């Protein structure tokens, strides 16, 4: 394993790329972005899914002294990138919702004293006192804002926590910011620059979102399951099938399996070990099809996906473009197919009312949350609770979809912080020094075996928390999972290590003290403007699915602000037009065109022209007289020529 040279001033960007990633050259606009942020300019990079965004901040950060702060809402992605960086010998760590205060303190101290190059952090952690206190002591080289469209209230995935980034900028006024996104309309681009406080010398780089190898197809059907089977039988290669909910992932997987198509499913409700195993089996082509909710796909490295099929309509062109774009990253021919039925438009329209329930309903949900947690008036500020949405809805007679939406709106309004399910892996750190650990002679055989297996299986256990798997430790030690758990709890009580069992639960944090529900203010910016923007995206998605005259690729690119784009020639609309042109008989030539064509080949006697063309003699004579007078043809003793 390589270690990162301290302060890589002697390494060029290309040397860093070659040393740690093995590539000789950058792709597309990667180098432009790297040189811009490396020179200290605030920079915005717009790159399509699969465009290599991570390289644009990882390479310049390695060329600078200090640590790069990477802000991202995607916990699974930050864990994956931290793991990949560590495998390359690059010191990186992550702080996200669900970590204990002790874990966070250890991580932040490592950022100050441990020569780490990257700190990945979720936006919700930016406003905490402990982070801001420690941040002032860090040597920060640059800030990277991933998924930067989340800072814009006009974006399809606005997250209020992103607005705290502007406060971080005030604390680090000389530190440049790199904002990255794969989906942003022109309106959102301007909002990103404004919200992040970009300086006058800032720069923006944009790759075209056009995917020349990807054919977009709308398939109208009232029997989506049968159409899905038909498509998968007619095509070859790895596939992703997106469904709207978790239940459907299982149902579709069972259907495909029954029909002899190898498939597995994935959604946020599965535990990490199951997710990892299924993802691995799909990547290694043990299963041809991954059936998933939109929880799947971010950061997945599988370039040979040949087809992405949507069983249900996404909420926006942004979401569809990102998910469809997971096909054909290897540059080979690929397909993105959306199955569209008559009922889909009605379903989309209903999503508006489900996503933005009435304000009085939202206030009722707030009051019921307080009852659920038995929160007294004026109390609650800073309190965190594990939360079971299904139980809450059963107790207070709510529909889960609407209650979930109400809680998200209350989060945007600043009254609560509600997160979906967090699947946090078990972690541990040794609290004794390595020498002290070996001096202790009071372990039984099973405990000693477990400690030795842990030390052989994981690294960095004396300086940072490491993710562990009780199942893996059970296999390697020959103990049961329960024995592993009990032993780790015992070692924690004896202060030999600190073990945090994995847990999987959503949670709610009170960001303000409890108040009367009638005092809840849902501003136009939080509610009406967001609802209107959401409705526009729904309409844009419906227009995309129902327009039978405009090239699909051109429609998507136009939505993202790219003008004067040629038809792709491969979507269902373009193919249909090409077939229609091919099926039409060649238009018949006019009599004038036939006369000129005849005389262009050879001079001809005037009296023979009508007979040769099998045309009316009178009509031909009249036409010949006109062409002679216009000097289009010449006559010489009754012989006509051009």
What kind of region is each of these model predictions?
Residues 287, 305, 309, 313-322, ...:
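C-terminal accessory region of SF2 helicases/translocases
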Residues 1-12, 582-590:
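Short, Lys/Arg-enriched, disordered terminal segments
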Residues 3-20, 24, 28, 32-54, ...:
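Helicase motor core with emphasis on the C-terminal RecA-like subdomain
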